[in-house]
Regions:
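N-terminal auxiliary interaction/assembly segments of multi-subunit proteins
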Residues: 2-174
C-alpha cells in the first residue's frame, strides 16, 4: 500500500490524522488520497504531489471541469475531481494516448472515468458496503456543485507536471 511522501514540509498522513477542524476522520480521507495517486500514476503515467487538505467553505469551484461521483449505502455523499481546462486536456491526452477535443463526448467520458476510478478504488479501501453512481461531468468556469449539508467537504490539492487539480471529498457514514 502506498504511503504518502513528505509534502510541503509535512507528512500527508500526519496532516490527515487531524483533519481540517477535526470534523472528518482520516479513515474516510486516506482512501481517496491513495486512490488519486494510484490512478494518476498508473493510468496517466503522471505522479501527483499532494498539499495539506483543507475545508471547502462554499459550493463554487475555482476550476473549469469537474467529474462527480455520488456515494450511497453505508457511505453517503460525493467525491469531485476538478481541473482547469488546460490541465484537464493534458491529463485526458495522457490518459488516452492521443489528443482529444474538449468539446467531444470522449473528453467528458475520460473525465468521468478518472472520477469513477478514484471513487471505485477508494470505495474498495473504505471497506464498507457502498455504491457509487454514474459519473457526472460539469464544464464551465465557476460552476457550483451541491454538497451534503452539515458534512464537511475536504479539499485535497494535487500538483502535477501538467497542472494542478483538486479532489473534494464530501462523505459521511450512513
Amino acid at each position: 500500500m502506498w504511503r504518502p511522501s513528505i509534502i510541503n514540509g509535512g507528512n500527508v498522513q500526519e496532516q490527515l490524522t487531524k483533519p481540517p477542524q477535526a470534523k472528518m476522520s482520516s479513515k474516510l480521507i486516506m482512501p481517496f488520497v491513495n486512490s488519486t495517486i494510484n490512478v494518476f500514476t498508473t493510468m496517466a503515467k503522471i505522479k501527483p504531489e499532494l498539499s495539506a487538505p483543507h475545508l471547502k467553505t462554499d459550493a463554487h469551484t475555482t476550476y473549469d471541469v469537474s467529474g462527480i461521483i455520488g456515494f450511497s449505502g453505508e457511505i453517503l455523499g460525493s467525491v469531485v475531481v476538478s481541473f482547469q481546462l488546460e490541465t484537464a486536456k493534458k491529463l485526458v491526452n495522457a490518459l488516452v494516448g492521443m489528443e482529444v477535443d474538449p468539446d467531444s463526448s470522449d473528453f467528458t467520458d475520460a473525465i468521468g472515468e478518472l472520477a469513477n476510478m478514484i471513487a471505485g478504488n477508494a470505495k474498495k479501501d473504505l471497506g464498507l458496503l457502498a455504491n457509487i453512481g454514474l459519473p457526472a461531468v460539469v464544464i464551465g468556469a465557476g460552476h457550483v456543485i451541491g454538497r451534503l449539508s452539515g458534512v464537511p467537504c475536504v479539499v485535497i490539492p494535487c500538483h502535477t507536471s501538467v497542472g494542478d487539480f483538486a479532489v473534494e471529498v464530501n462523505i459521511k457514514p450512513a
